[in-house]
Amino acid sequence: MMQKPKKTFSQFSVNLQELALISFILLMFCSCQKKTETLKNTDFIPQSIISLSPASTEILFAVGAQNQIVAVSDLSDYPPETKSLPKVGGFDGKTLSLETILSFKPDFVYLTDGMHNFLIEQLEQNNIKYYISSSSSINDIFSEMMEIGKITGHQAEAENKVDWLQNQLQEITDSSSVNLSANADSTAKQKNVYYEVWNAPYMSCGSSSFINDIIEKAGGKNIFANLQDAYPIVSEETILAENPDIILIPQSSGISIDSIKSRNGWNKMQAVQKNQIYLVDDNLLSRPGPRAINAVQNLAKILNTQ
């Protein structure tokens, strides 16, 4: 059973940090679920949409369907316009209810696989159409944006947005490849990356995770890419043995760079010796939405730091 990290701040601040990190982990686990068949009835254009995750909200805005949204999840905080939208509740079943959802009289609900499946039968009983998000890679995000654009009547906007994002991604990956090629005769190499999801016990990201896809597209090599599980528990001994070049820590974890450096034996790591420890915005890394490209871009800059 996952243990809570040691409390090193005030009780109030730690509770907020734990809430953010738990939400982050829930988002990650849900984003790696197997692709499911969602409702494909597109003979209508929804006018009263409820989005139950931050990533879904960002996708709706990205394809131009923001004026059709009647409510969003409490965790939806981007773009800034979401602050003025009514909130339907949190991300999981403990803070969501069918009664609250029905009070907004939606004709379409945007769900996340693995988290909102308990609502499906009830939505069907109330003749409310839905879509189940299950993206586990950037290419999945592009496909989902196209589907949502078509469903909401914004197919052209979705195509334009996806084309633009694909071009942005291509520029990033091309640049990363050029940097590696240019330094082929030097000591430069593809950098090994350790992403710390949790530290008690240690948890990282495997090959089937959304974060692994971001690391690879940025030009890095995930030290746990050999593990199939999306977010496996790993040993500290293995982390030390892998000797990563880069250490990434989610900002919401409350873990400081100094605390990483002070861990027993970690001072021998390349990443620690060369000060290559970074606090990263886990909202970008954990949300399978259009800003995943920003996550790739930010990580590519880190990887290209000499």
Could you say what each language-model-derived stretch is?
Residues 3-8, 16-18, 28-58, 96, ...:
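Bacterial Sec-exported substrate-binding components of ABC uptake systems
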Residues 47, 142-145, 150, 159, ...:
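Structured C-terminal subdomain patch of bacterial secreted/periplasmic proteins
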Residues 96-105, 121, 125-126, 234-243:
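Short helices/loops that flank or line small-molecule/ion binding pockets
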Residues 73, 208-231, 251, 279:
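His/Asp/Glu-enriched short active-site or ligand-binding loop at hydrolase and phosphoryl-transfer sites
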Residues 115-125, 246-263:
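A ligand-binding cleft/hinge motif common to bilobed small-molecule-binding domains
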Residues 53, 113, 197, 227, ...:
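Short secondary-structure boundary segments
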